[in-house]
Regions:
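RNase H-like two-metal-ion nuclease catalytic core shared by retroviral integrases
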Residues: 84-106
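Extended hydrophobic secondary-structure segments that form protein cores and membrane-embedded regions
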Residues: 48-55, 84-89, 123-124
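Acidic, metal-coordinating catalytic cores used for nucleic-acid/nucleotide bond scission
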Residues: 54-66, 88-94
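Two-metal-ion acidic nuclease core segments, chiefly of the RNase H-like superfamily
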Residues: 66-84
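Alpha-helical scaffold elements adjacent to nucleotide-binding pockets in ATP/GTP-utilizing enzyme cores
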Residues: 30, 34, 65-70, 100-105
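Short, well-ordered loop/turn and helix-capping segments at boundaries between secondary-structure elements
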Residues: 76, 103, 107-111, 126
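Electropositive, glycine- and tryptophan-enriched low-complexity nucleic-acid-binding patches
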Residues: 1-52, 56-57
Length: 180
C-alpha cells in the first residue's frame, strides 16, 4: 500500500510503498523517512511541520495510535512541532496529495499490470507533469502490527493541543522534554 507525501512548494512527491499493513505507525514512519531524506529540499524554518491529511485511513483523526506515533516518530525524535489539519470526510479530492500526486501516478500506470514491487516503484518514479512534478518512490520492507492499542497513560503523556476551530480535525503536537 502506498503512503504519499506531496511538497507543494517544490512540486515533489514522495511515495512510500509498504508490503505490510496500512497502519498509523506506517504513516508516521513514512513522514519521518521523508523528513530524514538527505535529498529532499530544505525549508527556511524547519522546527515546524504542517501535515494536511485525510480524516480517514491510517492517519485517521480519531486514531490515538496516529497521534501517539506522530508524537514519538516526529515531534519527539525530530524535535519539531507538528500541526495536523485533517480534511473532513468526503473532501479528500481537495487534498493536494490526491489531485497533484496520486491522480498523476494513476494516469501514468493506468492499464498496466503492477505485478512486482519494482514495476510499481518504477511507474511511480516515472510520473512527471508539464508543471515539473517529480516523484521519488521507496519500498518499505518492514512489518507494521495491526490493531495496536494506546493506553490511557500513553494518551495522557501526549503533548496534544487541539486548535480552537474544529479541534478534532486540527491540532498541534509538541515535542516532549527529554528525560535523561
Amino acid at each position: 500500500m502506498p503512503y504519499g507525501i506531496y511538497d507543494l512548494t517544490h512540486n515533489q512527491g514522495y511515495v512510500y510503498v509498504g508490503n505490510s499493513y496500512d497502519t498509523p505507525e506506517f504513516a508516521a514512519y513514512a513522514i519521518a523517512q521523508w523528513w530524514a531524506d538527505a535529498d529532499r529540499p530544505r525549508f527556511r524554518c524547519e522546527d515546524k511541520l504542517l501535515i494536511l491529511a485525510d480524516a480517514g485511513g491510517s492517519n485517521n483523526c480519531r486514531y490515538w495510535l496516529w497521534k501517539q506515533q506522530v508524537q514519538e516518530q516526529l515531534a519527539d525524535q525530530l524535535g519539531i512541532v507538528v500541526m495536523i489539519c485533517h480534511y473532513p470526510t468526503g473532501t479528500s479530492k481537495w487534498n493536494p496529495v490526491e489531485y497533484s500526486l496520486f491522480s498523476q501516478i494513476s494516469r501514468n500506470w493506468a492499464g498496466k499490470p503492477l505485478c512486482s514491487w519494482d514495476i510499481m516503484l518504477n511507474f511511480i518514479r516515472g510520473t512527471m507533469t508539464d508543471t515539473g512534478l517529480q516523484v521519488k518512490a521507496f519500498l518499505v520492507d518492514r512489518t507494521f502490527e495491526k490493531q495496536k492499542k494506546v493506553t490511557a497513560d500513553e494518551r495522557a503523556a501526549l503533548r496534544l493541543h487541539p486548535r480552537p476551530i474544529c479541534p478534532t480535525w486540527n491540532y498541534v503536537i509538541k515535542p516532549r522534554p527529554c528525560t535523561g
